[in-house]
């Protein structure tokens, strides 16, 4: 039965959004530590509010210089985002930075360093030695909506947010400020995106900017039209799109002065925009021994390769772990009726092609590197502006052979 007129919405935010400032700070601290000590154990949470940054968590590392320089790392990232003046409501050079970081719990460390398989079962494989850093469930997803195999609403929302930042930093629209949000509503027929219904852009701006005569036309021409021209989607009608710019009327007070921010509060923005399920774990500030992060990346890798191999047009995969255990305790594959082979067979070959033990994920995706700060805004998946290891299509042939 045909389903018409269904509207699905996803949102994105810019790097100047308060929650994203926190994600960026947490991941910048992580990268600084990994650059000096790839085996660093890091769990860093950040809070920002008017004039203040608080960085807390647990860290075990030999990167003494990077650890001692965390305050400067925080300031540099805030300034890079664009908060460099009290006129913008926040200044990385003069804000208060408070650090409260302790060591990783030894009870957690023992389960990660010596997994149950090694400690109790006597396993000799080195990859059985590293246990999951926590229990939990993680999802991965891929779909043929876009070349990057992401749901179109979140892919388009991210492109708009990135463009907002580009026109601000390049001086095309110099009156814009760092804080901003985008939202995209798309009409679907039988799971095919057919029409771009509504785009909402809320962007912080200088105080003297006219909404109707300056901001709205500039956003339409320099942001929306540019992104749509670049997107060039085959089935999407954009001729009647409604654009709403700053529906409150103005957006002068923004960033941490407008709202407090916290690490890990944009997990749907970070993943699939609500189109796929989420296990609940945030990414930023966590080293790859935390399966919240590394296993979610691995499952995106699995899903994307399944779709690229032609085994399904869209797929969602779930993995689950017990703390201190190396082997997953659960694996689930859902193809939504789009599989070209028996879905049971897909589920069977996934663990044959992909080693989902934490140590193997870290090895195969080369995750002990300072690559995380670039993921802190505009999504962790389907990125078209940076190369990320979990986006590689290096298992397609192996999957085809396996079926």
Curated annotation (Swiss-Prot):
Mg(2+) binds at residue 19. K(+) binds at residue 45. Binds 2 divalent ions per subunit. Binds 1 potassium ion per subunit. Transmembrane segments: none annotated. Pathway: Amino-acid biosynthesis; S-adenosyl-L-methionine biosynthesis; S-adenosyl-L-methionine from L-methionine: step 1/1. GO terms for biological process: one-carbon metabolic process; S-adenosylmethionine biosynthetic process. L-methionine binds at residues 58, 104, 259, 290. Keywords: ATP-binding, Cytoplasm, Magnesium, Metal-binding, Nucleotide-binding, One-carbon metabolism, Potassium, Transferase. Residues 104-114 are annotated as: Flexible loop. Its main location: cytoplasm. It holds the Pfam family S-AdoMet_synt_N. ATP binds at residues 17, 179-181, 250-251, 259, 265-266, 282, 286. One of its GO terms (molecular function) is magnesium ion binding. Its cofactor is Mg(2+); K(+). It is found in: Cytoplasm. One of its GO terms (cellular component) is cytoplasm. Catalyzes the formation of S-adenosylmethionine (AdoMet) from methionine and ATP. The overall synthetic reaction is composed of two sequential steps, AdoMet formation and the subsequent tripolyphosphate hydrolysis which occurs prior to release of AdoMet from the enzyme. Belongs to the AdoMet synthase family. PANTHER family: S-ADENOSYLMETHIONINE SYNTHETASE. Homotetramer; dimer of dimers. This is S-adenosylmethionine synthase.
